Regions:
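Flexible "arm" and connector segments at domain edges
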Residues: 1-117
Length: 117
């Protein structure tokens, strides 16, 4: 599998277009990506839910009752988090190219910070 970042993002854009056509949202969606506060808010709330499911998949961080670890479920929940973040970006009017550029810039800044510390 040699999908690029933009391929994953654009696949999710296509999927969201299908979701919108079949089910819709409580707010009108004209074009994706688009800046749509209501739909972005929906996906931010969904991200909170997905993050909770991710935490449940690996309880080793806890002080007690900390033996539960389900790697396959953790991978699934991490994937859900990434997909939902793509949705937040696309309903914030952010394209795949903009997001990839911002990620690259931020990662470069983090590397520079740690190397200069």
């Amino acid at each position: 599998m040699n999908k690029s970042f933009a391929d994953f993002f654009n696949d999710q854009v296509a999927f969201q277009k299908e979701v919108n056509e079949k089910f819709g949202y409580n707010a009108k969606v004209e074009n994706i990506p688009e800046d749509n506060v209501e739909v972005a808010k929906y996906h931010m709330l969904a991200l909170m839910e997905e993050t909770g499911e991710l935490v449940k998949s690996d309880k080793r961080w806890k002080n007690y009752r900390n033996t539960h670890y389900d790697k396959s479920n953790k991978l699934e929940e991490l994937s859900d988090c990434f997909i939902t973040l793509f949705n937040v970006a696309m309903y914030s009017g952010i394209s795949a190219e903009e997001l990839e550029l911002a990620l690259t810039k931020k990662m470069d800044e983090n590397i520079k910070r740690i190397r200069e510390a």
